[in-house]
Amino acid sequence: RIKENINKIENALDKIDKLDGVSYYNKLSKSNEIGLIAQDVKEVIPEVVIDGDLMGIQYGNMISLLVEGIKELNKKIEGIKELHK
């Protein structure tokens, strides 16, 4: 195995909530796109940002954050269901 110091992602929903999905015009590809702003993402989850002359986001590396966010939402939903039984 090559992974070490493995830790569960905590407070995924809080992190997701700090991000804003945007639409924008990409001057390089000359097309309208949707995504996130790398500078904003870097403040919340710097591990997924490629820092260079042009910043970029490794969107595939964000899947684990989204998975944990969904799990947190499911726990909240189950808690609400229990209250209404």
Residue ranges: model-predicted function:
Residues 1-60, 76-84:
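C-terminal intramolecular chaperone/autoprocessing and neck/assembly modules of extracellular spikes
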Residues 66-71, 76:
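Extended amphipathic alpha-helical segments enriched in small hydrophobics
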